[in-house]
């Protein structure tokens, strides 16, 4: 029997630690050497931090290497501000985040440390040198001209990087580190990036999660297209956990007092640093109150826009597998490892404190134990 095997990783920022712990436990129990994961899967797919993990495993790195990478982002004083090598350094206050979303044109973080990390991991290796096939989503932003109008506008194009020479896939000769940086350039968090080989005018690339945060279905489709004679496809899909992306508060829609707490910070900032009168300060604060409140709604909608399609794909594959549907005479065996976090926990994409990292490890251990029979 010919079997297609696929391993897929969701995006999720620092919550990717959840995926890394799963792979550690999975390899341990399956007797797979951690640095030889690539030998067991025809395709490894991943988006954002999941893309970094996919590229790492396809390069011969182990789950322990990935766990070490995540833990290296931790700050020693548990407040996000004392680890200059962290990819989320320097820290960004709640007030700065709100102000950037509403009025700024800069991202919260620069990608200098992320670039250094990826260069240290992948060096000058190119995609075609990876040890197994990979599939890495991203999105290209470029300038185009509206026909008969002559106006330049920004256009968007979903991109699938791969080392496979196949229709719809690209990037076989790109540096692995460039692909990793591209798929993880989360809007608002990190700036869009250039890839030297791409010559489209004003072309830049952003996080693949904007296109497809869960690439499991893509891995399935391309696996079957490349190996159509297989009788069975087995997909292992690894999530990063479902929680809040509220950025400022563990509660998805914070109560008015939370919003006003940040307004008070802003009020004090105006009084102390701008030397505005009390009357002028109150005028400014009252004028932006609706904007502050709308930030939370905006971020909840962003969260839904990412997690909704992600979980829809999970449900489709789950049902196809459950009811024994045959596509091109191929059986589908599908398992997804994921969890739902306590909504009272801070599960931001850029949370790096020790409490968070310990919580993620515990969540992975508990979910692995709960799914023990399924995993076997």
Sequence positions of predicted segments:
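Conserved catalytic cores and adjacent C-terminal regulatory segments
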Residues: 1-376
